[in-house]
Every structure is written in C-alpha cells, then in structure tokens.
Amino acid sequence: MENKNKQLGLVSRPPVIVVLGHIDHGKTTLLDYIRKTKIAEEESGGITQHIGAYEIEVVEKGKEKKGETLHSTQDDFSTVSRKITFIDTPGHEAFAKMRSRGAKVADIAILVVAADEGVKLQTKESLKIIQEAGIPFIVAITKIDKPTANLEKVKNELTEAGVLLEKRGGNVPWVGVSSKTGQGIDELLELIILLAEMQDLKANPNNPALGIVIESRLDRFRGNTATLIITNGILRLKDDIIAGKVKGKVKILENFQGKAIKEATFSAPVRVVGFENLAPVGEAFFAGKTEIEIVKPVIKSQKIVKELGKKDSEIRIPLIIKSDTFGSSEALEEIIEQLGKENGWAFLILKNEVGDISESDFKIIPSEKTLIIGFRVKKKPEVNNLLLANKNLVLVEGNLIYEIKDKLEEIVKQKFIEKPTEEILGKIEVLAIFNPIKGNQLIGGKVLEGKIQNKNNFYLMRAETKISQGKVINLQKNRAEVLEAKEGEDCGLLVSGAKRQIEKGDLLVFFKKI
C-alpha cells in the first residue's frame, strides 16, 4: 500500500474536524482554548453567526524540545507535530444547512454535550447530521468543572439517543473536558490524531487544488470573498478557480489568520478574493494554471423566485431579503419557512441577495404592501427617502436571527393581517324544521361547539357558504325558555331576519361584533 501511494504521489494529510452540538454547550470556547487565541470572540448575542475554519498544530506528547519548534512535513502526517483543521459551526437550528455542509467536508466530528445540561434537541439534530455524513466522531462532554456537572446522566442520555460509548457497550470514544481548566483537552487531541491515523487520510500535493466553499461574502472594500477548505492539491496565487458556475482568479490568498500567503495545500482553510460573483456555499471548487472556461449563469427575470411557508395560504406576503453572506441568506429562509408554517402564512420571496439595501431593490417591488429584511447590512442614502415616500414598504432590520424572526412575526400581525371584527360564539346543526310562528322560523338543533344565548346573531351556512344571517328571539330546552345552550345540548330556536328558508342540515354560526 505504501509503495502504491508513492506511485500515485499520495502523502498523508491532516484531518478536517467539524464541531457540532447544542447552542451554548461550549463549542467555540473549546476551540478558543485549543487554539490558545482570542480569535473566537463572541458575536452579537453570543451566537457564532458564520462558519469559521481554523488550523492548529499539536506537538506529540514527550517530544517537545525547549527553544525548538517542531513542524509536520507534507510527506508524513505522523511526525512529532500534527496539523489539525477545525470547522466551527453555529449551534442555532437555523444554521442546519451550514452545519450539514460543514459535516460533509470533515473527516471527523466532535459532538459537544454540556455536562450540566445533557442531550438537547440540537444535540440530536447534530448527531443525525454526523450519522448521515457517515464520518467517525468523538463525544466531548464539556463544562465538567461546573458544580452541576453530571457525567453519568449525560452518558445515560447519550445511550438513550443511540450513542454507544466506549466502555458502555460501544465504540464511540468520549472524553470529559473543561475549557476553563484545560482538563481533558490533550486527551481529546490525542483521540483526534488516533482516529485520523486509523482513516489513513491521503492527498496529492502535486495536483491542482480542489476542495469545498464553506463561506462566501461580499467585502465592500475587496469584492467577492470566499473561505475554502482545500481537500487535495495545492492552491496558488493567480490560479484560475471555479466553484459551481462561478469562476475567477485568485487575486488575494490568505491563511485563516488573515496573513497573505503565496500558496496553500490540504487541509488548510484559506480566504480567497477573486471570484467574479459570490461562490456558492457548500459547492466544490477546482483550481489550476489554465483558464477555466465557463458560461456565466443567466439570471432569470422572475417576479417570485421562491415561496416559503404555507403554500395555499390566503395571507401572501411579498418579501425581499438582503443579508451579509450566503450563509445568512439560507438561515433567514429557514426561519421564514418555519414562521410561515407555524402561522399559516405564505412568504413570496422576490429577491434574496447578499449586499446593502439600495435603490435597485425597489424596482421589483409590487404595488401591494411589501416587506424588506436587512440582516447585518446597511442602507444606501437614498433608501430612507424611498421608504418615506412609499407607505406600502416595511423595513425589518437586525443583527440576530432571533431578532429578525420576532420583529417579522410582530410586523406581519400588525400590518399584513386584518384584525377580526367578530368573535365566533358557537355553532348549531339544524336537525328539525317546524311550522313558523308569526313569520319567524322555528327550528330544532344540536349545539356542536361553544355556547349560544338568546338574542345572539348568526350566519346561515349551507355547503360551507354563507347565504344569510338572522337573530335568535327565543331559545328553549325541553320546551322551557332558557338564556343559553351549551355544547352537546339539544335546543329549539325561534329566529328572525333570515332572508333564506332554513333547511335541515344547515349550520348556524353564532357571533358577536368585537
């Protein structure tokens, strides 16, 4: 096998690790400790809003030499110093797509579970992503330094979730860690290196680069920027590059720390400037010295590019989304889809783009009331005047997914939904028709729901269609006059005002004005 690898030009490559788990279970703090840096500063609200990728170097225990830095070589991952690339994915459920894409590029996953909280919904979602990706994983039980930490409870919950840990009848490795004291961190890194060696990860440093786009954004100063994980070959400055249907040339190449470099190889995370358009997140990229010919995607002119929520809803809300990255755009679509289904609304997406809100966004807005979402973007100067001039435009801005969702729900309820003017009190099915009394209709029926009272108004419904309305002038039960009849009770009604003859099988819906 070793000779065959040499013939093919294959050498060992560092593993790519994805970290998954429930929100606030310590993923970013864990990586921050491992890197011994403060790169992972908290973003607004304490949620990491974008996938980041970081590379660390681990010196094999007992091989350190004072004053000497030991480096791994491309030809042998199993030297005294090993590189490991981490992908840090957000914990909020809205970023499920980004987590899923992160898992696909990874060789090993770390499932983070807090010792004081145990298995949560997003823990199970993360586990499902790992299993679907078919990659080995390690369970890191975090926050073991907390007084409320309960490792046995967590391990039992993991067993219930189908995770069979080592020494508990399974083969899933686990380790308790503390990002506060550093306990268990070395053991975790050793487990990663062990799993990587077992997988025998190989790549060819002489090939043109290929890999995955894990983030894409528009930098207002530098242009289209993409974060890439290289899975094979070598990427160089001035290489031609293509991802999906988007091509470009590597004009700027930086490592994960933002330092300019001339080349990078597997499994390095790099930042590239030079794509002609935003590179699609989750798409494979290819690079090389020869120009890559590609037909630019034709942007079709469509009034509605996507419909989210309840497709057959009577409440249909036109919507434009402007955000800072592709990842954010997808996350917003997830939230909008969920909000629509929860409330029975349909959101008609007219545009979903990365970039600031500008005058051009208003050219596609229909005459009816329309929502514009601005997520972590700015408004061009002319936008405020356009908003003032058009009362049908409603702008929702924010820096947090939660914030956008709450604002969106509140505004839709306030401005897009007609408030009910009536309250339904009860319903009666007509079971019998009697001779009229002084021109008023006399009927018998059963209260199907709610309750009805003497003097209540009602709608006469036939075949689910409102055909007339009237009023109760006398209500009886067992031939005795009463003030009300409740659900399940039989009653007799003398009604007036109905311009259509009431028939057996009709439905009377009783209401009052609000």
Model-derived features with residue positions:
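Conserved nucleotide-binding/hydrolysis micro-motifs of P-loop NTPases
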Residues: 37, 91-93, 115-119, 143-148, ...
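Conserved G1/Walker A P-loop phosphate-binding module
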Residues: 2-62, 82-86, 226-232, 239-242
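Catalytic P-loop NTP-binding/switch module of NTPases
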Residues: 4, 232-236, 240-370, 485-514
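Charge-patterned, long linear interaction tracts outside catalytic cores
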Residues: 225-241, 431-479
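Long, charged amphipathic helices and adjacent flexible linkers at domain junctions
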Residues: 5, 198-215, 289-316, 408-430
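Switch I (G2) and immediately adjacent beta-strands of P-loop GTPase domains
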Residues: 15, 43-67, 75-108, 115, ...
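Conserved Switch II/interswitch segment of TRAFAC-class P-loop GTPases
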Residues: 93, 104-124, 133-152, 318, ...
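Canonical P-loop GTPase G-domain recognition
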Residues: 145-206, 346-353, 361, 366-405
